[in-house]
A protein has these predicted regions:
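Short, charged low-complexity intrinsically disordered segments located at boundaries
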Residues: 55-62, 91-99
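Short beta-strand or tight-loop elements
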Residues: 83-88, 104
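HotDog/MaoC-like acyl-thioester-processing domains
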Residues: 1-9, 14, 92-151
Length: 151
């Protein structure tokens, strides 16, 4: 179990990889982001990216799934790793096409004691996803509450 004091700035967590299939891209987009370049291969071919692309929200949802899986693998006690008070600077930098595989990681960029919740700290991490060519496709800074029993 990891507490606030155990977390090192600069620490890196490899979260895993995910391959985006055409069917999964369309299924997610039909439910949550039904733009033509996410749901219609012909329309996408004639569009800005020249092919079907995953919704940025899809790439971000996969990131959250991998975060949850990493927490479960470490048997993280969610009561000790609280909710996220938010995120900053979400960027979708490269289109994600059907067949692309993104590999996700988190880099701890800062931490501080919570001003509003005694016994808790706020840890900030930069999450990145790189495609199979090594290009950064998305990134975001996420802030999370972590129990700080010495505070």
């Amino acid at each position: 179990m990891t507490f606030f004091d155990d977390i090192a700035i600069g620490g890196i967590t490899e979260l895993g990889s995910h391959t985006f299939t055409a069917e999964a891209i369309k299924r997610f987009a039909r439910a949550y982001d039904p733009q033509p370049f996410h749901v219609d291969e012909e329309a996408a071919a004639a569009g800005l990216f020249g092919a079907l692309t995953a919704s940025g929200w899809h790439t971000t949802a996969v990131m959250m799934k991998l975060i949850a899986a990493a927490g479960a693998a470490d048997k993280m006690d969610c009561a000790r790793h609280g909710p996220s008070p938010g995120f900053d600077d979400l960027r979708w930098l490269k289109p994600v096409f059907a067949g692309d595989t993104l590999t996700y990681r988190a880099i701890v960029t800062g931490k501080r004691e919570s001003r509003s919740r005694p016994g808790w700290g706020v840890v900030s991490s930069r999450f990145e996803a790189h495609n199979q060519a090594g290009e950064k496709a998305m990134d975001v800074t996420v802030h999370g509450l972590v129990e700080h029993p010495t505070a």
